[in-house]
Regions:
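Short intrinsically disordered, low-complexity coil segments enriched in acidic
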Residues: 1-2, 188
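Structured interaction and signal-relay segments at domain junctions
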Residues: 2-83
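Sensory/regulatory domains in signal-transduction proteins
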Residues: 62-121, 146-150, 154, 161
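Polar/charged, Q/E/K-enriched amphipathic alpha-helical segments with strong coiled-coil propensity
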Residues: 113-117, 123, 127-145
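Signal-transducing coiled-coil/dimerization helices and immediately adjacent hinge/linker segments
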Residues: 135-188
Length: 188
């Protein structure tokens, strides 16, 4: 699993700095879509949605789906269950999906698209304070698609490089352990 390959504190620090630099909310999840890092820079809108059990369930399922949407093992941009734009970069070790770096919680600048209307449609079955929800939604940043695509590529490169280093360190430790065990066996 991811936490056995890489120091989670290092991933947390990278995630925090990425989020600070880009302004995007971010979290790293395991193979089941469950966070292994603390969320960074989550919007008030998303934090509010996640305070409701059904909201948290949908967000977790969406995070899981987002990470797995990457059939070609490349980053992907998608719309979450609340209508916001998210991105997912798969973390892959030896051709196996072990988690994802997720970011976003923004709106894409699009003509002829009423994002707020879409959000209310997506969340119609939630028993929430609609006025408060609307206020929080108005605080969500609108960004150009180019910025989201660049962020997706960046987190894909960063996270997979770090995981490859971690996997290499694990292989080296295993080899050292095997050499030591063989030497101990021969010495006895």
């Amino acid at each position: 699993s991811l936490d056995q390959i890489v120091n989670i504190d290092i991933l947390q620090e990278i995630q925090d700095k990425f989020s600070e630099a880009t302004g995007l909310g971010a979290v790293i999840v395991d193979v089941g879509g469950n966070p292994i890092t603390r969320p960074s820079n989550f919007t008030k809108f998303c934090t509010y949605i996640r305070t409701y059990p059904e909201g948290l369930t949908r967000c977790t399922a969406c995070d899981d789906r987002g990470g797995r949407m990457t059939k070609e093992k490349k980053p992907t941009v998608y719309r979450c269950h609340s209508g916001l734009t998210d991105l997912a970069a798969p973390i892959i070790v030896q051709n196996q999906y072990i988690g994802a770096f997720l970011a976003g919680q923004v709106l894409l600048a699009q003509d002829d698209y009423d994002a707020k209307e879409d959000m209310f449609r997506c969340l119609a079955d939630f028993d929430m304070d609609k006025e408060h929800l609307s206020e929080l939604f108005d605080m969500v940043e609108v960004v150009p698609e180019k910025r989201i695509t660049a962020a997706a590529d960046l987190i894909y490169i960063m996270s997979n490089y770090i995981v490859e280093i971690g996997a290499s360190n694990l292989a080296q430790k295993k080899l050292v352990h095997e050499v030591k065990a063989k030497a101990d066996l021969e010495a006895s």
